[in-house]
Each structure stands twice: as C-alpha cells, then as structure tokens.
Amino acid sequence: MSFEELGVSKWLSEALNSMKIHTPTTIQSACIPKILKGHDCIGGAKTGSGKTIAFAAPMLTQWSEDPSGIYGLVLTPTRELALQIAEQFAALGSSMNIKVSVIVGGEDIVKQALELQRRPHFVVATPGRLADHILNSGEDTVCGLRRVKYLILDEADRLLSNSFGGDLERCFNILPSTDKRQTLLFTATVTDAVRALKDRPVPKGKLPVFIHEVETVDKVAIPSTLSVKYVFVPSYVKEAYLHSILNLPQYSDSLSIIFTNRTATAELLRRTLRKLEFRVASLHSEMPQTERTNSLHRFKAGAAKILIATDVASRGLDIPTVELVVNYDIPADADDFIHRVGRTARAGRKGDAISIVAEKDVDRILAIEERINKKMDLIEDISDNKVIKDSLNKTSVAKREAFMDMDRENFGEKRKINKSKRQANEGTISIHESKKKKHHK
C-alpha cells in the first residue's frame, strides 16, 4: 500500500518518495488513516520503525488544507530529539514553505519569543522551555498555542514520568481542551501510564482512542537484526576493555555510540579516548546547546566516529549508519537499555550492542534479559591476555591525564551553579504561582 492510498496528500507522498521513503511501515499503515479520521492515537512500536512520519504525515496533510496559525505542537523530552523532528518537518514541508520553530533550553529565549509571536506553523519544544515562555514571555507570545489542532507527545513514556510533571501541566493548561484538539502519543515502550490514557472517558463528539502496540509475540521491542552481547570485566579496568572493543577490526571504521550513566563519566571517557587518538564527540547535559548541536553534526557527518553520551541521546535520535552501541555503564531501567540499543540496527539494518558488565551489574543484566526476552551472548573476540598486552597500560595513562585535566578545569562546578540557579528559578515560579492563586481567590 502507498502513502497516497493511506490518505496522505499527493505533494507529501512526492516529498516522501524524494527522500526514498516509498512504502509505509506497520505503525504508519496502522496510525495514519485513523489520525486522518480524527482519532486520538497511542502508537507503540520498535525503535527505528518510522514513528515520526506516522504522526507527521497526517498532520501535514491536514495542515496543507488550512495552513493558518500554530497548527501543531510537538513535545519531546530532549533538545536533540526536538531539533531532529524539526529538521524532518522542514524537509517534508519544504515545497509548502513550512515554518517550524524549535523551543528548547540553551538557546536565546528572547529570539524564541519573537518566533512564537510570528505564529510558525508548527512548534517543536521541550516542556521546560515552553513552560518558561508560558510563565514569563507574555500573552502575545503564547496566545497562538491556544488554538492548536494537534498535540503530539513523542517518547510519551518519558514525558509522562514524574520528572516532567509540573512543566507538562503548564503546557497542557494553555492548549485547547481535549475535545477541541487531537492528541497523539508515540513511544517505543508503552508503559501503564501511557496505556491508562486509553481508558479515560471519551469527550462527547470525540472518536475513541486508537492504540497500536508492538504485537504480543513481538513484545521484545528490539529489532531482530540486532546482536546483543556482553563482556564481563573487573570494574577498575573498564576503559581497557572498551579500548579493545573499539579496536576490533569489525568496528575500527564503524560509527559507534558509547552510553554512560553520568555526565562526568562521559566527559572523562571523551578526554581519555581523544588522548588515545580516537575521533570522538560527546553529548551530555553539562555542554552548552551549541556544543551539543555541533557534536551531533560532527558525528552525523562522520568527522567523529564515536559519540559518548548519557541517556540524553538514547531517545529518538535517528542516525541510520550507527553500527555499534556500547553500554559502558549498565542502565538501572531495562527500558532505558531498549532505547539505547535502538540507536543501531535501524530500519532493517544490522547492528551490535555490547554491554561492559562489572560485578555489581549482574542483577541489572538479568532484569534486562528478562525484559527483552533474550539472553546476551558472551563476546568471544576479546581475551584478558590481549587486553593486558594491548590496552591496559596506555588506557591507564590516558585516563590519569584526562582526570587531571578535568580537575584542573574544575569540571562539575558549572553543574553546581546551574543547579543553584534552577532551584532559585523554581522558587520564583512557586511564588509567582501562589500569587496567581491568591489573586484568583
């Protein structure tokens, strides 16, 4: 079946064809017709299965028939995912002179306010920065949001977690009520919190919520083309084993993403690997937004072969040529593992995911294996003797030098300052809101 047969506009089908996207995926075939008919939608599918086009295609089709005001708002948990979605919208709608605004932290808030006042066709935002505008930028800036036709929550499971609660509520409060807009939720992991939304009462005149999930027999949510492996190591020599993995012939020229649990670890690894002459970039919350964007561009262009990242990069990022994901640290949540390894083996390609497992990680690995319904294979290409001979000494020296550099530059001080600023800002917001409540009383 073609996109046009699903109800997608001719101009948009041609745009998809020009991007070499000819045949709809399962989630696109299931969701696009339902969204075009007016259903709210919950879409769950494996990473790399085309979720963005599943919500973009019907929305752009209907927007092109009535392109006035802010037509749709897309909320995402990370800045990088917001930028990527905006790029896809801009590419798909280029022939229609589409205007897309990205509203994320780390960018000039005054410039963003002016963009919102000009009423772009679509806004792609992180909840925190949009909530900031709603509170502080004035009615002229945010009044266009009061008439949006669509609200999309991408990576909905993460957005509906407690960490986004207050900001998300502020964003929802300015939008039209649920009976006057369509709400679309997309995620690779359909959690109970997401699924519960289906059971809410349907407003009068609204169609029932359509839900598309990964089939029960295929509940794994990781691609069948993904090879999942592990290496068991002493925790104090993880860098040496990582060095050995990256030097294996099959990965020496691959695009690889290495995930860590902490920003300090990501920064230490970046500096260590750079001293070992790897072409590396990093992506974590301590970096200014311009540096984060530049790192991604370098990695996508192949100027950096390795991206070292915290979970800020585990959601939604679509870099099809990534062949290897390394879990340098094992995530506490099995769903985070699924999102991390989903950065490779995308759209039918093959990929490898290797987890570096220390003594303390065994319980986490067992929980992950149960969640993905698959046993990891022990990687056979690496021996302890080879690591000691080829990697141990040089990685120890590089790590020590990297650590001294970070200490000298006071890495981490910025985090403390930003935390203090954030707490002060939250205090200001609480005072602001309590004053508003008193005023309304």
Curated annotation (Swiss-Prot):
Amino acids binding ATP: 45-52
CDD domains to which the protein is assigned, alphabetical: DEADc_DDX49 (cd17955), SF2_C_DEAD (cd18787)
Residues of the Helicase C-terminal domain: 247-387
Reaction catalysed by this enzyme: ATP + H2O = ADP + phosphate + H(+)
Keywords: ATP-binding, Helicase, Hydrolase, Nucleotide-binding, Nucleus, Ribosome biogenesis, RNA-binding, rRNA processing
Pfam families: DEAD, Helicase_C
BP GO annotations: endonucleolytic cleavage in 5'-ETS of tricistronic rRNA transcript (SSU-rRNA, 5.8S rRNA, LSU-rRNA); endonucleolytic cleavage in ITS1 to separate SSU-rRNA from 5.8S rRNA and LSU-rRNA from tricistronic rRNA transcript (SSU-rRNA, 5.8S rRNA, LSU-rRNA); endonucleolytic cleavage to generate mature 5'-end of SSU-rRNA from (SSU-rRNA, 5.8S rRNA, LSU-rRNA)
Disordered, as annotated region: 409-441
DEAD box, short sequence motif: residues: 154-157
Chain location of the short sequence motif Q motif per the record: 1-29
Domain comment (free text): The Q motif is unique to and characteristic of the DEAD box family of RNA helicases and controls ATP binding and hydrolysis.
The protein, known as: ATP-dependent RNA helicase DBP8
Species per Swiss-Prot/TrEMBL record: Debaryomyces hansenii (strain ATCC 36239 / CBS 767 / BCRC 21394 / JCM 1990 / NBRC 0083 / IGC 2968)
Top-level taxonomy: Eukaryota, Fungi, Dikarya, Ascomycota, Saccharomycotina
